[in-house]
Amino acid sequence: MAARLVSRCGAVRAAPHSGPLVSWRRWSGASTDTVYDVVVSGGGLVGAAMACALGYDIHFHDKKILLLEAGPKKVLEKLSETYSNRVSSISPGSATLLSSFGAWDHICNMRYRAFRRMQVWDACSEALIMFDKDNLDDMGYIVENDVIMHALTKQLEAVSDRVTVLYRSKAIRYTWPCPFPMADSSPWVHITLGDGSTFQTKLLIGADGHNSGVRQAVGIQNVSWNYDQSAVVATLHLSEATENNVAWQRFLPSGPIALLPLSDTLSSLVWSTSHEHAAELVSMDEEKFVDAVNSAFWSDADHTDFIDTAGAMLQYAVSLLKPTKVSARQLPPSVARVDAKSRVLFPLGLGHAAEYVRPRVALIGDAAHRVHPLAGQGVNMGFGDISSLAHHLSTAAFNGKDLGSVSHLTGYETERQRHNTALLAATDLLKRLYSTSASPLVLLRTWGLQATNAVSPLKEQIMAFASK
């Protein structure tokens, strides 16, 4: 149930299928509600990390923070030998954020897998691009979501004097401030929970997912559409132990398939394909599923002589202009079996909020943007939001400013929209460009991939952008 928008002068219900109706009117009056400096609505990875970032900020030592999580507290007493099928690719920038408040140490003491190279290639041609670093720095880390959540929970428990966490608590109503000319004089946000309890906050941060109740309540428009794809995830056992420090991604005509390292013998699968094919993959027997995965990575059945010849000609021309070592295509490790019950699917889509902030409101993570998993940037975009917003709020707290003032919230919005919009557009373009086997488009992307792979500075810029 989406939270309903209420004016201070009485409840205003939205008409069927309309956006929230707002009755702005000046209000004044006393209240005995508990007041928090910041309330974070949504206690998933991004919401919990946002609460941690503020809870450990030196300029927030005298602030009160509330984290609302609709689900129960997740306790990870000990690691299971079986890996979870829900993992995230953590960029170096995100690892730095997690390190800033101590969560990364917990992750390192539990389990994660670093990868130092990434190979991306086309199923319809020989075109590929290889990302690696000469100094052998880690390009990223594959971490189970449960491990990240455990680390964040531990760190939240250590600052319980600053951060209050309410589990099984969901906001059902927000009472919004009137849009006064001066944000500093604007009333605070009133929040009503399902059990009837109420709070006030100087700043409400929406981290409540792509169906964000905060975003809907404040009336921020969201541009979104569903893709004609679902993602199948699973935990795979390799045929033999390997160093397994490469992330593999192949663009099939039906969608990208990725193999992400978990250990010497295990990898995580993310296969984006049509809804019908995804349902088949989840329901087929193990042997057929394993054969389908290996074929998706190894088969050249979608190649054509015309595309291969044209690609070879460009590769030859590039070698004449730049006679350096060219990346040779490598094959990923073969898969032997799949963990029982690890296969699940979820639908894919794109979304982007027209605004990230309003007076006393900020959106982060999936509440502000939703992206296709082919870029592996979903949670990293959310962590990037946290780094930016926490910086602006810390500066405001240091200077004694109102945390809910748009004067510094818009700085966060400008920074993150510039970054996120570019990434969303590029990801959507790649999804559409690689979802076809039409020869002209295959040739275009083949030449584009080969040219990009040949220009080292361009590859370095791409890696730098993705690592933030």
Swiss-Prot record:
Compartment(s) of residence: Mitochondrion inner membrane; Golgi apparatus; Cell projection
Presence of keyword Transit peptide: yes
Annotated GO MF terms: 2-methoxy-6-polyprenolphenol 4-hydroxylase activity; 4-hydroxy-3-all-trans-polyprenylbenzoate oxygenase activity; FAD binding; oxidoreductase activity; oxidoreductase activity, acting on paired donors, with incorporation or reduction of molecular oxygen, NAD(P)H as one donor, and incorporation of one atom of oxygen; oxidoreductase activity, acting on paired donors, with incorporation or reduction of molecular oxygen, reduced flavin or flavoprotein as one donor, and incorporation of one atom of oxygen
Keywords linked to the UniProt accession: Cell projection, Deafness, Disease variant, FAD, Flavoprotein, Golgi apparatus, Membrane, Mitochondrion, Mitochondrion inner membrane, Monooxygenase, Oxidoreductase, Primary mitochondrial disease, Transit peptide, Ubiquinone biosynthesis
InterPro entries referenced in this protein's UniProt entry, alphabetically: FAD-bd (IPR002938), FAD/NAD-bd_sf (IPR036188), Ubi_Hdrlase_CS (IPR018168), UbiH/COQ6 (IPR010971), UbiH/COQ6_monooxygenase (IPR051205), UbQ_mOase_COQ6 (IPR000689)
Consequence of substituting D208H: Found in patients with Schwannomatosis; likely pathogenic; loss of function
Database matches in PROSITE patterns: UBIH
Tissue: Widely expressed.
Matching Pfam families: FAD_binding_3
The keyword Flavoprotein is annotated on this UniProt entry: yes
Stretches assigned to coiled coil: none
Reaction it catalyzes: 4-hydroxy-3-(all-trans-decaprenyl)benzoate + 2 reduced [2Fe-2S]-[ferredoxin] + O2 + 2 H(+) = 3,4-dihydroxy-5-(all-trans-decaprenyl)benzoate + 2 oxidized [2Fe-2S]-[ferredoxin] + H2O; 2-methoxy-6-(all-trans-decaprenyl)phenol + 2 reduced [2Fe-2S]-[ferredoxin] + O2 + 2 H(+) = 2-methoxy-6-(all-trans-decaprenyl)benzene-1,4-diol + 2 oxidized [2Fe-2S]-[ferredoxin] + H2O
Pathway: Cofactor biosynthesis; ubiquinone biosynthesis
Catalytic class of the enzyme: oxidoreductase
GO biological process: ubiquinone biosynthetic process
Presequence extent in this chain: 1-28
Bilayer topology: Peripheral membrane protein
Oligomer status and interactors: Component of a multi-subunit COQ enzyme complex, composed of at least COQ3, COQ4, COQ5, COQ6, COQ7 and COQ9. Interacts with COQ8B and COQ7.
Disease: Coenzyme Q10 deficiency, primary, 6: An autosomal recessive disorder characterized by onset in infancy of severe progressive nephrotic syndrome resulting in end-stage renal failure and sensorineural deafness. Renal biopsy usually shows focal segmental glomerulosclerosis.
Function: FAD-dependent monooxygenase required for two non-consecutive steps during ubiquinone biosynthesis. Required for the C5-ring hydroxylation during ubiquinone biosynthesis by catalyzing the hydroxylation of 4-hydroxy-3-(all-trans-decaprenyl)benzoic acid to 3,4-dihydroxy-5-(all-trans-decaprenyl)benzoic acid. Also acts downstream of COQ4, for the C1-hydroxylation during ubiquinone biosynthesis by catalyzing the hydroxylation of 2-methoxy-6-(all-trans-decaprenyl)phenol to 2-methoxy-6-(all-trans-decaprenyl)benzene-1,4-diol.
UniProt family annotation: Belongs to the UbiH/COQ6 family.
Protein name per the record: Ubiquinone biosynthesis monooxygenase COQ6, mitochondrial
Species the sequence originates in: Homo sapiens
